[in-house]
Structures are given as structure tokens and as C-alpha cells.
Amino acid sequence: MLTRHLATIAALIAAVSGAAAQSAAATAEQHVAEGDSAYAAMNAPAALKHYQAALAIDSNFYPALWKASREAVSLGEFDTSKVSQKTFYSMGETYGRRAVAADPKDTNGWFVLARAIGRNSLTLGKKERVKFAKEIREDALTSLKYDSLNAGALHVMGRWNAEIMRLSGISRFFAENFLGGEIFHAASWDSAVFYMQKAVKLDPTRLVHHLDLGEIYYDRNKGNDRALAKQELEFVVNGKDTEYNDPNYKKEAAALLAKIK
């Protein structure tokens, strides 16, 4: 009899624990859904708070991890405080690393990690920036291994090629020695254009793809590149805002467009 009662109690405890776990998971999912709504409304601060609330319930909840990384980096991108910007970028990288640990075979974790490291590296001098180039490339390529049509990872690869090609003098020498000749010489303006054009084709309403493609055309400056740059930049200036940082992207596009006109 006692054994039967103990078994019944154990079963009840297991059922309650299971129900609690399901409830927590549902709540985490609810916070992610609310974060997604805030993201769609271009409210990055609110989106990040919801994703963080989900992680407070389940610290390894993959959708919340990679999306929290995305929003943290977006918040840091145009932050005028270098300290605050660094904090957001570090937060984005931390969430990205936790995301790939939680699900190493999904494309989005690797993409946001590459993006976070890439954005953080752009705050550094060119020589210091090179030290992160290898990991950025590896993470972006891993993302593309799991989804060759991930527009964000394609964007990172386009930007990676462009940043290597923008190096000059001692920075270029340092990059070749640090990355190794095979990786360094794999970078080209044509590859930068190829990857960014694919990102634009896959996600044509996203203004940042057009902005960076315009900047690549402007810097490559081959043939009718300046006319192509103008076309992309005008698209950004006249395009519809769909993301938190689009107003800032429009300002950058307008400033570069003024140099062409």
C-alpha cells in the first residue's frame, strides 16, 4: 500500500513538474511573440526587453537568444555613446555565442554571431579589425552552410569582402599575414558585389542591403559603378522604413548620394 501511495505521489510530482515546464516554455514563447511584434513595429528596445524576459524564464531558449543578439546589435549601431555601443555589441556577441551553443545547426545563430563580431570590429582601428576577420568569415559561411539563402549571412560576406578590399598599406600587409594568403586573396570587389546583390535579391525591401551595395559600387568605382551606386542609394532615400535603423541608413545614403551628385 505504501509503495502504491509513493508511486502515486511521484507520478503527481512528475505531472506537476511537467506542466510547470510546459507553462514556462509557453510563457517564453509568448515573450518571443511579443518581441517579434515589437520588432515588426520597429521598436528595438521593446523587442530586446521581451526576448530578455523569455531568457529569464528559459536561458537556453534558442529563438530568444538569436533575436536578442539581433536587437542588441541594432541598438548599438548608431549609439552615440562609445561605452554604451560597446556594451550593446558585447551583449549581441554573448547572445550569439549562446545561440550557436544552444543550436549549432541552425543558420540564424551563426548569422547574428558573425554580425555582432563584425559590427564590433568596425569600431576598432583597421589593424585591430583584421584580427576578427577570420572568425566573421567562418561564422557567416557556417550560417550559409545551413541555409544558402540567408540574406543576412550573404550581407555579412559581402561586407567582409568589401572591408578587406578597403584596406591599404600596412593594414593590408598585416591582414594578409594574419589571415593567410589563401583567405586574404579570396576577397575581391566582385565577390563583395556578388554576395550583396544576392542579399538584395532575396530581401529586396531591406534598406541596409541596398545601402551597403551602393557603398560597394561607390568604392569599387569600375565602369558605371557610380551610376549603380546612385541607383541603390536613391532606393534607400526613397524607400519605406521597415526596420529600427532605417532612418539612420537613409541619412547615410543621402550623405553619400550628395558626393555623387
Question: What do these predicted regions represent?
Answer:
Residues A7-S17:
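Bacterial N-terminal signal peptides
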Residues Q22, A28-E29, L167-G180, A186, ...:
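Terminal, low-structured helical/coil segments at or just beyond the last alpha-helical repeat
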Residues A19-D58, Y62-E77:
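N-terminal leader/linker segments that initiate helical-solenoid repeat arrays
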Residues M1-H5:
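Positively charged n-region of N-terminal signal peptides that target proteins for export
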Residues S37-A46, N60, R70-K105, V112-L149, ...:
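Short coil/linker segments at helix-helix boundaries
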